[in-house]
Regions:
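Alpha/beta-hydrolase-fold serine-hydrolase catalytic core, especially in secreted/extracellular enzymes
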Residues: 306-323
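The serine-hydrolase catalytic nucleophile loop
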Residues: 48-59
Length: 323
């Protein structure tokens, strides 16, 4: 057992969330966010059913190591951000809020760190605001119209999520938070009661869980829904114009990029010549709960390697480098 792994196993990642809560009004929505550090901004964007809490053990380390300003927001309906009275959550809403958040905080020359639904949302910002994004780090996300064959053993459950039964499963039973979230982490011992209580806290009622149900319905699968397909197509059509460093952090066995879907990543690399792939090691979907120290190291070392913050270069941008 190597020293890093031994140290990790002796120190379970902290469940604490010791950040000052900050709020900003974006398009009439009360958006919660956290930040730490000074310098060039590194913006962390979560997916379903998480929040800025997901980044609690990653953001401070990245901000310190890169001498940057780490920022993580909660999308509407998640974390401590406000919920929509009409429950009308949509991909367009989430994008406009992300775009407005960046504008309201005056964030310039961004590095984006994106997970799950944060991937399409952040990449849409990158292709529409190429002059304001310096680099993008991605993990366990998608930038393509998916296929049912991509889902493997989860095909049935995601079909149910997109059916009327999804209301019972996700909003009444809280299945996504209670089962999918902890079940998508290999190191289950990390998903302690305290951690799960943090993740459950924003969703005390069936109505409050509406955004958790909406995201599975929005996933572009074989061209549906059309709004999501068009959203993804705009990103795909502009990837070659995005002349910035892009990092993909790949876990084994992974959940979105697996041995059966790695062809997706190869196809993406063909469109993005500045894409680097770094191996995370053992993990499923929520890598932030697997080994946040490892994740922070990969992100920070890569950022420094691009010399974005005028720091000494320590890494090379090489496709499928198993650093």
């Amino acid at each position: 057992m190597d020293m890093r792994k031994e140290q990790y196993e002796s120190e379970r990642p902290s469940a604490a969330f010791p950040f000052e809560s900050r709020y900003v009004d974006v398009l009439g929505h009360r958006i919660h966010y956290i930040e730490e550090g000074r310098g060039a901004p590194v913006l962390f964007v979560h997916g379903n059913p998480t929040s800025s809490y997901l980044w609690r053990n990653v953001l401070p380390a990245v901000a310190t190591d890169t001498r940057g300003r780490g920022i993580a927001l909660d999308l509407p309906g998640f974390g401590r951000s406000g919920k929509l009275a009409d429950g009308n959550y949509s991909l367009d809403l989430y994008y406009r809020v992300l775009e407005g958040f960046i504008e309201n905080l005056g964030l310039k020359d961004l590095v984006l760190v994106l997970h799950d639904w944060g991937g399409p949302l952040g990449m849409m910002y990158a292709v529409r605001h190429r002059d304001n994004v310096k680099a993008v780090a991605l993990m366990e996300t998608f930038l393509w119209d998916t296929s049912w064959k991509d889902y493997g053993k989860f095909k049935t459950v995601f079909k149910l999520f997109r059916s009327p039964i999804g209301y019972l499963m996700i909003q009444v039973m809280n299945f996504f938070v209670n089962k999918i979230l902890p079940g998508s982490v290999i190191r289950t011992e990390n998903m302690t009661r305290e951690v799960m209580d943090h993740y459950r806290q924003p969703f005390p009622t069936a109505a409050s869980r509406k955004p958790v149900r909406v995201f599975p319905q929005l996933i572009p699968i074989e061209g549906r829904p059309e709004t999501s397909r068009l959203f993804i197509e705009e990103i795909e059509d502009n990837l070659r114009r995005l002349d910035i460093p892009v990092l993909w952090i790949k876990a084994t066995p992974g959940a979105i990029i697996t041995s059966n879907t790695e062809y997706r990543l190869v196809a993406l690399a063909a469109r993005m010549p500045r894409l680097a792939v770094k191996e995370f090691g053992s993990g499923l979907h929520y890598l932030q709960e697997e080994d946040p120290r490892r994740l922070a190291e990969l992100i920070a070392e890569w950022i420094k390697g691009q010399n974005l913050h005028n720091l000494p270069s320590e890494t090379d941008n090489i496709l499928f480098d198993a650093a």
